[in-house]
Amino acid sequence: MRESQGKELCADIFIRNRRKRRLRVEIFENICYNKEEQSIIFWRQKRRRNKIKMQVFESIFLDKAEYVFTAGGRINVIGEHVDYCGGKVFPAALNLRCNVYGRKTGGNSIRMAFRGIDGIVEIETDKLDSYKGLKIGNYQAGVAYFLQKEGVEIVGCDLYYDCTVPFGSGLSSSAAIEVATAVTLCEYAGVEYDKVHLALVSQRAENEYAGVNCGIMDQFASAMGKKDHAVLLDCSTLEYEYVPLQLGEYCLVVANCNKPHNLVESKYNVRRQEVETALKAIQTVLPVKCLAEVTPKQFAEVRYLLSGVVEKRAEHVVMECARVHSAVEALKAGDLVELGRLLNESHYSLRDLYEVTGKELDALSAFARKENACLGSRMIGAGFGGCTISIVKKTEVEGFVRRVGKAYFDAIGYKASFYETSIEDGVTVEKL
């Protein structure tokens, strides 16, 4: 047998074996219809991933990882651009996560390595106020700095960051990194902590150390998430309620439009000014502390005080707050069709009244809504790029992604990224 024929035969055998393995997986997944079997698959995938990452850790730090600390990225089911208006939000933690493989070393050095990034970032625990300019590692340094200011002893450790939350997607990769770091450092310091405190420390690190203006929702969901539940959260008081997010034969598909984020913060600040202007006008006739306290009926009676974009912005906030409560009731009643309708309404409002979508998010959402397998779709996050979420029938996800992805590419000129998600716990700690 000639060498070229041998190579072709080996390649053919490899391809056929790979097809057989893929077929076995597809068959197994098709018959895997209950939660117990799904949990077995998830456990096996996690164990395999941990084994690979432990090998990576050892190749970098020449020692074995002891623990993996994780925190979730997040979606906000509904309730966009209302948190700074006193409204309630409805986030949930995802299976897209920041996983920190760690080993306590003692001393005063924290060494960090990152998936997809060459080299090691090293910070000293007695110089934590000097790393604000770091391009990589400043979130971690900020968390360590504020924990130390609270009296937590920050001990030396080696950390490998494996983050599956897409960066720049609006799924809060920064919050997941911060919260996972916070639980890591608290565990290694041997101190008791509660998850709300982890969220608050993480938010403070992002605001005051990294210099990024954000509310508490992202870190709260990342820390406090609960499997198969969303969190109805009042960002002003931190009062919260877990609401079962049972989608049955449906799942949430996240689509990233992959548009570069430009000038998001400046547009965000303009929107805040506009709703504050609306509130001041409404307060001349109604004794309310925030726009979220205004009911749709009251708004109809006082909207004459507003005009132009200020009126549109206020209308979105008032109606979106009402939609949050309606969505909670729909979930409690098991009415997924109504939930989907509310997601669609939310997107229309963000597009027409708050004007934070853009052609990319509008295209993704519109193409999703054309699919019979989709109950509803809307943008999530600050807007002007980022992601949509869609409620899609599980058995139709592959076709949904293929058709929506093609339509989006044909319309926009570049590809979207899709993620079939599950709702998971926020913070987890696992000994390896």
Q: Where would I find each of the regions flagged by the language model?
A:
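Short, positively charged and aromatic/hydrophobic N-terminal segments
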Residues: 26-34, 40-41
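C-terminal nucleotide
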Residues: 49-74, 99-133, 229-376, 391-432
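Intrinsic-disorder-associated, low-complexity terminal segments enriched in Asp/Asn/His/Tyr and depleted
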Residues: 12, 17, 30-34, 50
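Short Gly/aromatic-enriched secondary-structure transition segments
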Residues: 86-93, 271-272
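Cationic, amphipathic, low-complexity segments that mediate targeting or membrane/lipid association
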Residues: 21-25
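Gly/Ser-rich oxyanion-binding loop with an adjacent helix/lid
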Residues: 53-68, 75-79, 84, 88, ...
